Amino acid sequence: MPMLRLYARVLQLLGKEAMLGWVLAGANLLLAAAQFAEPVLFGRIVDVLSGNLSTGAMAQPAQSPWPLLLAWAVFGLFTIGCGAAVALHADRLAHRQRQAILTDYFEHVLQLPLTYHTGTHSGRLMKVMLNGTDALWRLWLGFFREHFAALMSLVVLLPLSIYINWRLALLLFALCVVFTVLTTLVVRKTYAMQGEVEESYSDLSARASDALGNIALVQSFVRIDAEVQGLRFVADRLLAMQMPVLSWWALVTVITRASTTITVLAIFTVGIALHEQGLTSVGEIVMFVSFATMLIQKLEQVVGFVNSVFMEAPRLQEFVNVLDAVPAVRDRLDAIDPGRLSGLVEFDNVSFSYDGKRPAIEDLSFTALPGQTIALVGATGAGKSTAIALLHRAFDPQSGVIKIDGMDVRGLTLAGLRRNIGVVFQEALLFDRTIADNLRVGKPDATEEEMRIAASRAQALDFIERSELKFDTNAGERGRMLSGGERQRLSIARALLKDPPILILDEATSALDAVTEAKVNLALDEVMKGRTTFVIAHRLSTIRHATRILVFDNGRVIESGSFDELLARRGYFAELAHAQFMVQDSARSAMPAAQPEGIPEF
């Protein structure tokens, strides 16, 4: 995205603060005009005191300097007051809008599909959020507090100086041209280079986050030195890329400062020559020297502004790219909140593909009545998880219809749909908050008694009560203060607390020991009564009592029936059962006490 368009997008992100932005822009224009009153009045006072008449448009008879001094004081007070008001409101605008856009970004990212998050490192998204909002804050603050006034000063100065003395004004105009050409060349030279620098910053953030997120692996495999060396390599590469960019902008700074001396000398030289010919006055020479000094100052601010926009551009581009990412699913304009559903689920010729080439789900049709338990089995990548993801609209199918209680799920609000579905993931997902906070994800207004009941039914109450802080115990980052079994039992309790009509169990008992698994299965059997339950299973022992089992292979259901019916068919499901030693050749109904070690799970 070109830099001007990118900055226009930055101003567009002002949102509700845009009106205040226009007010500040008008105030900056008045401030710019008032600032140039000082050198004009100063020059007039010099002419009055020296007895010389100004020339050209400023030619007037000599007069008392006191009215000029009074006008100078009035303009000075106005400049101070207006500048303070602009700075105060610019600060407030920038701070308020930074928090607003940060919240909008966070909400937007949470709505992006799981496929987006799978392909994007969470550390990178955090870095983009924090760096992007900080960059916006700096640009908004600088633009409305200083840089816009500097731009307006240039707009005011050039016509004003031409009006006073066009010959001396040509020197100021030449200075502006030199600055514009120089800055444009440097920006073009270094724009792509700065983009590579920012990409390295993202790599640095992602690598550090990756190492910290796997600290147990790093320490147990003695990888500390290797990870530090890897980070140092990325940092060194970043520094090597950044140095040429800094060198170019340092050159601009040097030339800017050198131009101050050159311009002032040129004005004095040309001014003296014009004065000898009677084409200018001493006051006008002094006035234009002040103009030149102010012009250099304003140009430095403008160059600083361009430099800051340039340096922030890659960060802003990343930020805008995330904001422009489109969620896979959205509420339709006519979407309705269905309230509490009964749990009648229908898949009618549903097909879906992630890449548009290989189908992940193809012509899937089945009906689950309220209270039934539907198990989905098959090899990894067969389409089980995709089918369930379509049910709660992580994606929408390319063809076919999914209905709940006879209503197309695409006609329901996402919040209304997902409020009716409880999920227990294979990997227990917990926040770095208290146990109570994690449980209330399922029901925000849950009482402690309700949490105790849910925890008890999930076999989690015992370990919660053993803790000194009980439900106020912090679970740690991603629940790391708890064991795997404890985390999973809390996630089950959370789903029970939600009390949804539709329940999804993604190998929900895989992290539990045999004794606890048996207890939790008994609790789940009781809880699943009256609910439509979908069980994604790899261990076939967990789905023996399912109402129906759907056997997936390459996105299709190749077998369907009860546990015993599928065994009797001696098909693919029976092969899976044999592989897990769930049945014996002589008696298919006999179940082993435990799965032997070394037998792979499917």
Curated annotation (Swiss-Prot):
Binding residues for ATP: 378-385
Primary role: Involved in Beta-(1-->2)glucan export. Transmembrane domains (TMD) form a pore in the inner membrane and the ATP-binding domain (NBD) is responsible for energy generation.
Membrane-spanning intervals of the chain: 22-42, 68-88, 146-166, 167-187, 238-258, 285-305
Family: Belongs to the ABC transporter superfamily. Beta-(1-->2)glucan exporter (TC 3.A.1.108.1) family.
Protein name: Beta-(1-->2)glucan export ATP-binding/permease protein NdvA
Species the sequence originates in: Rhodopseudomonas palustris (strain BisA53)
Entry's free-text remark on domains: In NdvA the ATP-binding domain (NBD) and the transmembrane domain (TMD) are fused.
This enzyme's EC code(s): 7.5.2.3
GO cellular component: plasma membrane
Reaction(s) the record says it catalyses: [(1->2)-beta-D-glucosyl](n)(in) + ATP + H2O = [(1->2)-beta-D-glucosyl](n)(out) + ADP + phosphate + H(+)
Topological category with respect to the lipid bilayer: Multi-pass membrane protein
